[in-house]
Structure formats: C-alpha cells, structure tokens
C-alpha cells in the first residue's frame, strides 16, 4: 500500500430488514388487518415483521386469554411463506408497554395507568399468566425470530391517557429472565431511543450529571436497555416535533444517528451483543410533518447501510398503505439496506 495507507474496513453484513405492523392501525381506519398485512408482505417482501401481542387485547378480562388476533396475523404470514421464496419471520413484542399509541396497552381492569399501580398489576397472577402463556404458545413456532420484551420500557412517554408508565427495573429483570427460562432458544431484546447525537450519548453513559445539566431533548436509556436485553433495539427518528436542528439536512441528521449506532454497536460488541434499528423513520411525523420525504427515506437507507446493524425495521406502514409512492419508497429502501456491500454515503 502506498504511503502507509490502511485498507478500508470491510462493509458490515447486510441486515435483516422488515417493518412493524399493528392491527390497531387497520382497525382504526376501518380496514381488514389480515388484508393489510398480506398487502404489505406482497409489496415489500420483508425478512422480518414485528407484531405486538397486546396485553389488553389478549386478556380483556381477568382469568381469560384470547390469542385470536395474534394467531390470525401469524396465519397470514404462514400463508405468504407458502408461495414466497423469501421466508418471513416474526419478532413478537410482549408486555404492558407495546408499540403504537398510547404506548401502555394495559386492560382497564388492571387499574390506574401509572406507577405504582402498574407495577403491582404486573406482579399479579393475571399479568404473569398472559406473559408466560404467550411465551409458551409461540416459542416453538417456526415463524419466531426473537422476542421483544416491552417497548421503550425505561422511557417516560407522556400522553393524556397515561401517567408515569416506565417499567421498573425489577419487573424488567423478571420478564427477561422468564423469557430465557421458558424459551432459551430465542433472544429477548428491548428498545429505547437515544440522544440527538453521539456526544450526548457519551455524556449520558459516562458523565450522567453533566448530561442532565445539558439536555434539552429526549434522551432515552440505551446503556440500561443494552445491559438488560440480549440485543439493543434503537428507535431512531430524524424529523419530528422533538427533533433539534431541523435546519440541517435529513442526510446530516441521519449521519448523526449512524454515528450513534456505531458507538452503541461497539458497546454492544464488548458484551457479546448486537444493535438493531427497531424503528427506522419511513414516513413523515403525523402531527408535525416537517419536510421528511420519500427521497429522504432512501437517503437514510443508504446511510444506515454503512452502519453495523443486524436488524432494521421500518416504521410507517399506515402511510405506505395510503400512498403507493411511499409503499414503493419503502420497498426500495429495503433493497438498499439489503445490498451485499456498503453503498456510498450521500452528501451531507
């Protein structure tokens, strides 16, 4: 090599790619969840689909469990796999905290939607029956890729229907241990978001008191989530109402997130773990659309393809179902993320 130049690092292996789907989306829009999921599978040809097993839908009354909703969605995927060359697998999300508004999906009979009552409900026999029965029911499914335990459990998500809904560390320890006990063959991961750039992530991990004094934006709990689960799932949004520096290009903001992924991947590797991008923005923010476009989605995909990720799940299927241009962009983004070698990063 001339001038002592080092050879470039080999590109990261292509991640498994897919999307998150909730039947609540289709029900709210007066659509058929099975039809919508089938459409998404056919159009995007994913490797993975993340599905929720909602506590409130599964255990509408104490002592009664009904897995009909989840079973129907899994059957849609099984039907798809019978004729598809790419076999789709699922990540099942279980717990009181699950993805999609209002974040805490606890049944009304469980009591007030906040701590400490939430913690007491999760220690009760009914919640634990739901949790254990879900693990036992699906652990032998050939569709199962992994479990996600709770959704952003350490993060406070404020809304008008929920109070302090963070899951206690003790409860998370029990749930992860229970998943390992009842299903040692599949990983149990959990999720969070991060600060808006890697410098603040570093401060949070190493100088917490300084970070607390500096922060003005949601920070998440990536260090705690990494320590808790078998992999770290990051939910990353580059354009929304809480996004600082919206004057910067989406490509630049995405590159900041990619730097954070590399930082947390190094931390994960030291623990024998990996990082997943469990929510990659693939739609404009609903209440504050900003300027996130379908082209920005493709830019983000090219940036993230150069990051060390094992799983990437796009977020925004309700937009794709309503707009063919977004469905096409999502499909193209998955193709970019699957490229066998890293792609040139776009200009910032």
PLM regions and their residue ranges:
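An active-site-proximal structural segment forming one wall of the substrate-binding cleft
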Residues: 39-44, 69-89, 111-149, 171-178, ...
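Aromatic-lined substrate-binding rim segments of carbohydrate-active enzymes
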Residues: 33-108, 162-191, 250-257, 300
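Substrate-binding cleft of secreted/luminal carbohydrate-active enzymes
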Residues: 89, 273-347
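N-terminal carbohydrate-binding accessory modules
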Residues: 2-48, 85, 180, 184, ...
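Active-site groove signature of glycoside hydrolases
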Residues: 54-55, 95-102, 127-163, 313
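Hydrophobic faces of well-ordered beta-strands that scaffold small-molecule active sites
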Residues: 15-21, 47-51, 90-94, 145-149, ...
